[in-house]
Amino acid sequence: MLSTMPRASLILIALILATASAGPVAQQSKPQSAQTKPLFSEDFESGKLDPNVWTQQITGDNVITVQQDKVAHGKYALKVSCPVPAQRTLALLFAKNLPEPLRHHLFGRAYVYITSGVPARHTIFFTAGTTGFPASKYQEVATSNGNFQVTFIDRADANEDWHAAGQVPVNRWFLLEWEFNDQPDQATVWVDGEKVIDTPFSYHTPGQSTDLVGGFTDITLGFRLRGAAPVPFDIYYDDVALDAHRIGAVR
């Protein structure tokens, strides 16, 4: 009887029988979910700074504010401003008690906009280290003479190890990423996804050091100027995050 059936019908019957004998069809795996939230993050979208997370330290006429005029994403971003010429001045946010997985190795991400007046002298953007900045041990992302600089600083010994490379973009938003490692001591900086610095720290040893900081418990964000600011400048930060792996761009 089957021999008299059209060939197309025979193929259809064979497919039905094969499907039935194979049992239920396996469920397709779902697409990867959205990126999990970093261990520490601040997008400033509340429109204000949470005093339970951040404390401030400001000198002179400097200003720290959450504003809407210039943002990378969303409605709000942080602005730290040096509105008049100054000498050895700062405007910093402090956060303490970083999550344990970040204590010896962390990755950071921030969107940054720097006006063209940023001083040529050493200016700190971000630090991670022990409690008591600046009289503490820490690693930093900074600028000097228009380039990025990463530094290990031990103020107790009044000594440091620093490395500079890569021009700092001005008058536009850019994606700044960094890696700080304390075991062994090393720092990396990426700008818009391109690596600009990747260096070990060597301090009181002939080669790469380890555990110089002794644990990243506290961070600072903003600016600390270690020289003169001959003209006013502003720095904007948005979508700041820290995690135990590289975070990448906002998705």
Which residues are covered by each model-predicted region?
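Bacterial N-terminal signal peptides
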Residues: 10-20
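Extracellular, beta-strand-rich glycan-interacting domains
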Residues: 42, 231-248
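Extracellular glycan-recognition surfaces and repeat-rich motifs
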Residues: 48-80
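Secretory/extracellular carbohydrate-interaction modules
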Residues: 75, 79-150, 241-250
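Localized edge beta-strand/strand-to-loop motifs within extracellular or lumenal beta-rich domains
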Residues: 172-188
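Flexible glycan-contacting loops in extracellular carbohydrate-active proteins
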Residues: 200-235
